[in-house]
Structures are given as C-alpha cells and as structure tokens.
C-alpha cells in the first residue's frame, strides 16, 4: 500500500510517499523562511499556495517512477486537518480534496499532533508510551486511554517553540529562534529564571518576560539563552517524568520540532535512564513538521477504515488530539498506572525515592542530573520546605495528612508518618473523589494550594483519604492558582480512570461544599484556555 501525505499546518509545505510494503518514506519539503522577525501568517499562506503544488508534483513524479507501471499507484491521500494556521490549512485541504477526486482514492484527515506521536510509536515499537510533543505552537503530554490520546499535561499559555521565538524576536533575531538560542547557549553561563510547573501542566509566559527583562538589564545574551534553555527543557523533562510516574509507563516518545534540540534530548534520555525507562526520539526529518508522519498515520487510519468524505473534510485550526477517536489502536493496552504498594522496598516517584520503615516513611528528593546543578539544588530545597510546612498546615485545618517528624531541605529528606494502604488510583470511587474536593476547598480557604493533587498524591485506607506531597504547593489567594489545583486533579482522573465523569462530578460537588465560590467558574476558563480548546 502507498499513501500520499500532505503537510502544511504553518511553515512547512511538505508532501511524502509512504510504502507500507518496504517501509520507505520519501519526503519533499519547502519551508517558509521570513526575511525578518517571526512567522507571518499571511506570508506563510502565500508560501504554502506556491510551494505546496510543487512538492506534491515532485512526490507524484516519484510515485510514477518507483511503481511497476506508468500509473501513479496511490491508495489514499492523507492530509493535516489541524491544528494550525487557518489560511495554511485551507491550502492543504484544497490540495488534498483535489487529489482524492482526481485519483478516485479515499481521503484521510490527520491530526497533526497525533502524527508527531505516532511516527515515534511506529518506529520505536513501544506498546504503552507517554509522548511529549514539543513543537512551535504546542507542548503537551499524551497517553492512550479509552480509545483516545488523553492530554496528561500541557502548556497553559503558549507553545514552547513560539515562546522561544518571542524572546528571540525581542533580540532582533529572525525565525526560527530555537537553533539560535541553542547555539548561543553553548557559550553562556546559567542565569536563574522562573520555573513554573503545576502538576503536569506548565507555563512559559513568565519565563519569557523575565528573559527579556534580563537582556534589557544587560545580562549577557548568551547567559540568558543558557538559563532559558536549561529552565524550559528541565520543566518539560520534569513533567514527562511526572507523567511516567502517574501512568506507570516505562516508555517515552518525543515529538515535535523543538525535539531537534540536542540539550532537550539529552535531558530526556538522562531522566529515562535514571528511572529505567526507554526513550525514543525520531530522526530530525520526522521531528520537524513533515508529510512523512502524516502518511504513516494515514496508512494506519486507512487500514482501520477511518476515512472521510470530501464533504466532511473541512480543516480545523483548533483540532485537539483528545478529540480524535483512535480506532487504529482500539484493542491496545491503555497507559494506566499500577498503583504503588509502599512496603519496605523503595518506591521511586517522579521526584523522590520513598522507603517505608515500620510506621515511618523516609522520602528523599534525589538529585536530577539532567537539571543544571544550581537549579536542581534550589528546587529540591524549596520543595522540601514547602512540603513540610504545607502538610502540617493542612493537618491543622482538619485535612488528613501524615505527621511530619523531620525535614532536611539541604539533603531533600523528609521523615513522616506512614498513612493509607495504597494510592487513590487503586480505589477511585465517587465518595473518595468527593472527599478530595472537600480537602482542597479547605486548604484554598486557608490561602494555599497543593500544587500537584493527582491520584498519585492521595493515599487511602478504609477510613481516610490523605493528601500527601505538597512539594509544589505555595501560599496564594489568587483564584487562578486555586482553580489550577482542580484542573490538575481532574486531568489526572480523566487520563487514567475508566469512567471519569461521575468521579469528576463528585469531586466538584465536594469542592463546592467547602471551597471558594469563584474557583469553579475560573476552572471553566482554564479548561477553555488549554491549547486549541
């Protein structure tokens, strides 16, 4: 079978021919290069209109020359349906519809972000991976569950590549900015910048503002580039590890154009090696936007019968990956976590190694060799202090938490009471989720947040539901911060539960009984602000 793929979501006009028989993938691309500054949507669309017919023509000629007859011999057309820039997508959609009618072959509408994931799955052979997509307009973590790729975590403002480009435009550098930052960082020293992780979600806007201010205040550009790269990529690596810990997966796939950065791949590889996980990053031609990944996913969708009619083939600039029904992997195992049983054997979480000693638990935040040493020391100490203080503060409010016996921020070590029999994930019931909502409402009314209230960070037994691991928590009266706590919990339930809807309803009901009235309306705002809602 031979599939023609067409890509053109933003800057890359690309066509590809994928032969499933011998796994050959021929790609022809013509990227848009602005004369100055960043990517201009109108100019990108004009480039797409000119370049896309040319790359398609080249691939069609290749299809004829590589076939056994003079016929083109293409079985289906797959195209990027979204997400992306509307004007560019419309050019792609028109080209795909024209070809499918001219050749009388089926049409397949592909989600661009799932294609970034699936090319890595296809080439690695992984069975239940978490995928980190790091591209220009996007950054998110995906895992297959309940016939969808669930979003386990994502940027709450801008994509990682776009964030870096905003900084480089401030310097007067033209698009793309990522390779220029990578080159400059080789000569710089680490400069401290804000580090914003909330559960498995993250934010780049504050980092960009701080980086611009640093340059304006005459901090050497190379130092700011080093700090920017170390901070952003450490955040992405941390949330990837958190996703592995939450789901229990031991496989990580990297996708997206930012994945071409050597330092990001080094960090992810180091993290996976440390926790005994496998890591796969496709070669560069499959990381940047390309039609090869569209053709490969298109072939899988075609074999599963997931084609569309021309009348139903409208492009979607806001096409989220979790809106796609994944029929081509319908019989596969979900990315779901085996709940931890904390006995005397050490248990490794995302941040720490935890060991039970009789009725005590010793938790040590381990050094993360992927992070810059200065950043690592800062985070380990800050989070150990926060966990000790906020765990005790929550307990004083009547929220079930373990007693803290000792805390050493310098070594990142805590000693606390052993509580619960297993994680909430092992007994994820309506009543327990209702109780978690009540607990979060109480701490929010007291002026602080948990920071990472996933099903991994609630311990349960027959009598209680204990909140643990307040390391990402902090004091705040901002409704946005409180709503993010709710968002993190709901996201963890959605990504792992077999029937999340009644659990989420119970959780929100519990919060309404004890929490702040404006928080749930802000939660709806946050959900609508996620990338491409």
Swiss-Prot record:
Q: Name one GO biological process term.
A: tRNA threonylcarbamoyladenosine modification
Q: Which Pfam family would be a valid example here? A: TsaD
Location relative to the cell: Cytoplasm
Q: Name one GO cellular component term.
A: EKC/KEOPS complex
Please list the residues that bind Fe cation.
Answer: 112, 116, 289
Please list the residues that bind ATP: 347-354, 363
Q: Which residues bind L-threonylcarbamoyladenylate?
A: 133-137, 165, 178, 182, 261
Sorted keywords for this record are:
Acyltransferase, ATP-binding, Cytoplasm, Iron, Kinase, Metal-binding, Multifunctional enzyme, Nucleotide-binding, Serine/threonine-protein kinase, Transferase, tRNA processing
- Active-site residues from the entry: 452
Region of interest (Kae1), residue spans: 1-328
Q: Which PANTHER family match?
A: TRNA N6-ADENOSINE THREONYLCARBAMOYLTRANSFERASE
Designated name of the protein:
Probable bifunctional tRNA threonylcarbamoyladenosine biosynthesis protein
Organism field: Haloquadratum walsbyi (strain DSM 16790 / HBSQ001)
């Amino acid at each position: 079978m031979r599939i023609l793929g067409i890509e053109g979501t933003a800057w890359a006009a690309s066509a590809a021919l994928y032969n499933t028989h011998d796994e050959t993938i021929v790609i022809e691309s013509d990227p848009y290069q602005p004369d100055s500054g960043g990517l201009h949507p109108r100019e990108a669309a004009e480039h797409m209109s000119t370049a896309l017919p040319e790359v398609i023509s080249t691939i069609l000629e290749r299809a004829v020359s590589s076939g056994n007859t003079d016929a083109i011999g293409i079985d289906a057309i797959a195209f990027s349906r979204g997400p992306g820039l509307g004007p560019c997508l419309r050019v792609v959609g028109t080209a795909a519809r024209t070809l499918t009618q001219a050749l009388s072959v089926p049409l397949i509408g592909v989600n661009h972000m799932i294609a970034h994931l699936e090319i890595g799955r296809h080439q690695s052979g992984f069975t239940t991976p978490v995928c980190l997509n790091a591209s220009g307009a996007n950054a998110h973590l995906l895992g297959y569950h309940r016939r969808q790729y669930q979003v386990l975590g994502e940027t709450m403002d801008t994509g990682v590549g776009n964030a870096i480009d905003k900084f480089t435009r401030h310097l007067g550098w033209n698009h793309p900015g990522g390779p220029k930052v990578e080159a400059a960082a080789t000569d710089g020293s680490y400069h401290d910048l804000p580090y914003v992780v909330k559960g498995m979600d993250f934010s780049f806007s504050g980092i960009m503002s701080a980086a611009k201010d640093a340059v304006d205040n005459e901090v050497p550009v190379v130092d700011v580039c080093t700090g920017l790269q170390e901070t952003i990529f450490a955040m992405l690596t941390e949330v990837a590890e958190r996703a592995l810990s939450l789901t229990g997966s031991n496989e990580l796939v990297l996708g997206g154009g930012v994945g071409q950065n050597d330092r990001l791949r080094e960090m992810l590889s180091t993290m996976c090696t440390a926790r005994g996980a496998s890591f796969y990053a496709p070669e560069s031609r499959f990381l940047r936007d390309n039609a090869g990944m569209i053709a490969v996913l298109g072939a899988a969708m075609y074999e599963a019968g997931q084609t569309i009619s021309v009348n139903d083939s409208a492009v979607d600039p806001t096409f989220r990956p979790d809106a796609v029904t994944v029929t081509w992997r319908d019989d596969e195992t979900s990315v779901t976590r085996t709940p931890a049983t904390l006995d005397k054997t050490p248990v490794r979480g995302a941040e720490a190694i935890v060991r039970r000693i009789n009725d005590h638990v010793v938790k040590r935040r381990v050094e993360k060799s992927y992070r810059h040493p200065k950043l690592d020391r800062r985070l380990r100490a800050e989070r150990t202090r926060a966990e000790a203080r906020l765990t005790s503060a929550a307990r004083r409010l009547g929220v079930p938490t373990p007693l803290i016996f000792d805390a050493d921020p310098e070594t990142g070590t805590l000693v606390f009471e052993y509580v619960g029999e297993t994680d909430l994930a092992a007994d994820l019931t309506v009543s327990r989720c209702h109780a978690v909502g009540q607990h979060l409402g109480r701490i929010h009314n007291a002026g602080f947040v948990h920071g990472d209230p996933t099903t991994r960070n609630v311990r349960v037994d027959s009598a209680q539901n204990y909140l643990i691991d307040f390391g990402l928590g902090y004091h705040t009266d901002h409704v946005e911060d409180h709503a993010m706590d709710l968002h993190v919990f709901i996201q963890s339930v959605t990504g792992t539960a077999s029937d999340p809807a009644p659990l989420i309803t119970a959780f929100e009901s519990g919060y309404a009984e004890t929490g702040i009235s404006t928080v749930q309306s802000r939660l709806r705002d946050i959900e609508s602000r996620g990338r491409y809602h």
